[in-house]
Amino acid sequence: MLGVLLVLHGSKIPEWKDVGIKYAEYLSRYFNLVEFGFLEFNKPTLSEALSNLLAKGANKIVVVPLLFATGTHFKRDIPRLLGIDGDEKKIQYMGKEIEIIIADPLGFDEKIGEVLVKRVNETYNKNY
């Protein structure tokens, strides 16, 4: 069964968790098993979120980093926190082999660009 794991950076500001909750709720319309976890500062951690998916029966996990570009978090921290060694895409969980695939960062996307235009216009109209 497919599990989706959203990865957020995390912040000392508690409201960051609301973003994870909203994106998880949105993706739950399309996928049965969706969890989110943070790289730092907030809970659930990536490890906790992964454990939740596995406990619910996921045996294939697509990890979706809510990051704009590749960097240390993408290349080193996410795999390490998920227990992935090197180029391996599998972990062991309670005697079972679990496949984990990490999606590319968001990068450039015109739909995200449209959101940025909307934010600029909203902010401008609110303040001028």
Swiss-Prot record:
Active site, UniProt feature: 9 (proton acceptor)
Keywords: Cobalamin biosynthesis, Cobalt, Lyase, Metal-binding
GO molecular function: cobalt ion binding; sirohydrochlorin cobaltochelatase activity
Keyword Metal-binding among UniProt keywords: yes
Protein species of origin: Saccharolobus islandicus (strain L.S.2.15 / Lassen #1)
Biological role: Catalyzes the insertion of Co(2+) into sirohydrochlorin as part of the anaerobic pathway to cobalamin biosynthesis.
Superkingdom per UniProt: Archaea
Sequence positions that bind Co(2+): 9, 73
Presence of keyword Transport: no
Amino acids binding substrate: 43, 68-73
EC id: 4.99.1.3
Pathway the protein takes part in: Cofactor biosynthesis; adenosylcobalamin biosynthesis; cob(II)yrinate a,c-diamide from sirohydrochlorin (anaerobic route): step 1/10
SUBUNIT field: Homotetramer; dimer of dimers.
Catalytic activity entry: Co-sirohydrochlorin + 2 H(+) = sirohydrochlorin + Co(2+)
GO annotation (BP), single: anaerobic cobalamin biosynthetic process
Protein name in UniProt: Sirohydrochlorin cobaltochelatase
Family listed: Belongs to the CbiX family. CbiXS subfamily.
